[in-house]
């Protein structure tokens, strides 16, 4: 009869072969690690999603019903509700585009401080709008209104971004940092050109241009939403389906390559999808620099995982909840609907400064 193995005082004996302290182990079962370390992290994620969904539902109901004095169910009631549904549709598109684009951009660049705006989307939008008003006067605003100009502006932004990173990343010495640096320089040059043209405008034209360049949810037209919504949904779905690839890209170029992933190709494909999202939202409502950074930072702090399958939905839900809540409070309580983007940008800018000061570096 075999004698039991001696163990050190105060220590439990080792489990028999083929077992662990948690129970028996099946040698043929594939080994895998989950997105969450503990069950508590998974429960916390469910609670976060439930809370954000509740906030989104309550704020949506408030936007639709608050201040609608028409008799419920009447034609006037549904006419008012339909107008508000269009605003909610714009908010949903903006939240989707900024959240998915910013989180994906953070992943491929390996930096959670910068935003896709660094590629010069907003500077190009401002330059095109300013040039139209500079050449055509006040009529330039009308020229930029319509489905054709909307698609043309979005396509121009996508082409510029695609040409930028495909040219820089395809070269042997190309790198993400070089691409970002060139994007900053181009954005600064376009901004300086726009400022120069704006100084030469007459006051009336400048006033019309300023109203267009100010990011505002009310700027979006119904025909724009019908085009932007399917594109945004399809691109966001593609990014979510590529979540596992984004998880691998987040490990770094060397680790991703060793795991069999073509890192540069994944980088270019992701940047193309990000460019489409940013072009859609910028052409739809105008520049909103810090919205994506705000909701992405919020998602990182709420979700205890690095898996993009879980981060991306929370970022989009947080973006929708933040925008609808701000829209409801400022438009229906303080009657200052135009200040929604101002408040969002203010909070996002403060969050950016706090994050930079805590990290101590860019």
Residue map of PLM features:
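Alpha-helical transmembrane segments in inner-membrane proteins
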Residues: 2-362
